């Protein structure tokens, strides 16, 4: 939840969720 994955999740889910990223405040974060 602290490291930005460089991906937004406004319209689509985080593709980077496969590496542990999750959506928070319309941006994908890791940890």
From Swiss-Prot:
Disulfide bonds join 5-21, 9-23, 14-28. Keywords: Disulfide bond, Knottin, Plant defense. Expressed in pedicel, root and stem but not in leaf and fruit (at protein level). Pfam families: Cyclotide (PF03784). Coiled coil: none annotated. GO terms for biological process: defense response. InterPro entries: Cyclotide, Cyclotide_bracelet_CS, Cyclotide_sf. This is a cyclic peptide. There is a cross-link at residues 1-31 (Cyclopeptide (Gly-Asn)). SUPFAM superfamilies: Cyclotides. Belongs to the cyclotide family. Bracelet subfamily. The presence of a 'disulfide through disulfide knot' structurally defines this protein as a knottin. Probably participates in a plant defense mechanism. This is Chassatide C5. It comes from Chassalia chartacea.
